[in-house]
Amino acid sequence: MCQFLGVAQEKGILRGRALEKGTKEPLPNAAVTIVGTFYQTLTDFDGNFEIKDIKPGTYSVKFQFIGYQPILFNDIRITSKKPVNLTAELQEQSEMLNAVTVVGRKNQVDLEKASSAITLTGNEIGKLVAKGVEDVLAQQAGVQRTTDGLQIRGARVYETEYLIDGISAQDPLAGTGGGVSVSSSSVGSLNLMTGGASAEYGGGSAGIINTRIKEGGEKFSWGLNYQTDQIVDATSFNTDELEVTLSTPVPFTKKKLRLFTTARGQWTDHYFGSTATQLKSSLFPDQPEFWAPRQSNDYTHTVKLSYANKTVGKFTLTNSHSLKVNQNSRTLQIVGFDALLTPGFQYDRSNNLDNATTYTHHSNLTVLGWNKRINAKTGLTISAGRLFTNLRADANGRPFRAETVDQIYDEAYIFTGDLTVFNPNDPYGNYYLIPGNGLINNGGVTPIWHDHYAAENTFKGKLTFQPNAIHTISGGLEHALTEYQWVDVYRPWVGAPIVLNDSTTTPSVSIGSSNDIWKVSPQKGGLFAQDRIEYKGVKATLGMRFNYWAPGKFADNAVADSTSPVLPAIRDAYNQNSFNAGGLSWKVRLLPRLNVSFPVTENNVLYFNYGHSMRMPHPRFMYAGLDPQYQDRSFLSSLGNPNLNPEVNISYEVGYKTLVGSRIGWTINAFNNNRFDYIVSRRVITTDATGRPVTKTMYINQDYAKIIGVETQLNARLNNSFTSFFNGSYQQARGKSNSARESALQIAQTGEVPLTQEQFLAWDRPWKFN
């Protein structure tokens, strides 16, 4: 027994040297860490090191030296039989700090992160069955894909922050959570953070999706991919896909300037059966057969230039462009506000799709980035971007409305085909007509006409300072100048002139039966600071973010104008809760962040994170109907609330990560997300431009939700060419209401909202496995 214990307690030894790559000079005081353990030491004056009493196993060893790029050696096997020698040659950094060079295969789980985050490289994405970024994300734990979009950990689709090369690529007005689309082949890396995001990120209360576009390689390469389902007609949805990629160094630049570009088109008629004769977009009126040959038409194009030089650092220029033309009603939605959760196919118009709502979503993002290591301890990253996105919904390319109305357009008031008389023997003569199967096929047109655009100019800067091997301090700022225009008209032909005879025409009296029209220029931004501490295996990040925003002159003028319909209580609260600077009214909020991880045993890490995050309310609920000269007089029209606050999430998470050898990684975590200040609708009484009292729908911060859940993921590398993963999750999403409109409906039906009762929310998906 004593002899057995003596053998079991034998330990291994790791020794080696840290050198400068170019000169082979030793690097004294370089930090050497065995990841996922408490083992850590510094090199001596000659660059040598030795770590004793290591439990036998397979580890990752990390070398760090201030001013040099860290190196991570994976699959280092420590045994008790003989010491393991390891020499690391570190290269001086010319770009951003903390970029790590990995030697060996990528670990199946990252033991250094105290968060729920996954990073996929372009090669890993290429092995998945995925055509776009959303397809890749839908396969991850905690992510649900529904008809509305991607929902992360029980949150609503619009709560996720979607970035391309660090700049927002999200349409802030569409309500879908998406915006600029990119193909999976253009992705260099995809980082999904569902919990524990750092203070650098401040725009998403559910999660962060950061896509890095590929850069051109050292050699010329190109690719062509074409797919179709029309080989066998019996199973065809009339789908075609074409994608072209190109990667090359630019001639005469000594391979310092590189180009990557990809273009992709996807055309399909889907599986619904019914299709329009020809989709038409009023944004692209010429050649509709080219832009919309099928029922759904998606185009993406991405190009990236990169230039690296040791003296000036690294510059990148990215442009991503996407266009969608389809009849999917989920293209425009305010889910979680007042839209119903329904599929996107317009079933009631399936016999009349030539007059159904056609959506055109056109987006363009340009990002200029620069990063440079200023000295051995300091690095700087700067990026500037412009996002422009435009969404149009109309009656399959028809103009807004004709100059005069000479026919009935309302689908509900045109009856054709077989009609059945209901209640024909009623003694009072009350007869009802049942219009066949109820599907619209009568020459009427959709009552929806919508157009919005968003232009965002964003600047970001981040400074990183590493005074020693223990602390890495970073701070920065972000500021966005925005311009939003919203035009939403229902039944646009209502109020148009009517020709009475050859000489008499009625005047135009309204823009549709109801409308919502505004143009605003709000601003938003944030400051952040954080300190990442690494000491003997323990890693902690302490961060704080200071977010600020200004609703803009439009809201300020509406509050200051006594003739505007802003309620007195809202006007007083707006003035009390904001401060003036630069001619605008501003609001602020502090968002603390904390991440901690520490090893329990070798290659077994426990982590915890806590954080506050926020999401700005949809602009529609802040600005609708505030212009005193232009107001919607329809019943229960919307009235903006400029004093709305952001929706807030306070999250807690605890998790456990383990590496079993070098081939298997396992993670399990539990989270608790408490969401506050969700927006709900209420009916209020105010006065219109004529002074008469009117009832309007206004929105306030009052709702909440609570989401709890457990997630697990298992990654395995079976051999050099075959890898596999499994993930599963269980969660509960509970709250008072599914949408902003639901609470108002409860008041209308019962006279109250049960404040103490919760229900499972409509988007709650308890179980998911991949």
Task: For every predicted segment, state its role.
Residues 104, 224-228, 261-267, 317-323, ...:
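Transmembrane beta-barrel strands of outer-membrane/channel proteins
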Residues 381-385, 605-607, 611, 621, ...:
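Membrane-embedded beta-barrel scaffold of Gram-negative outer-membrane proteins
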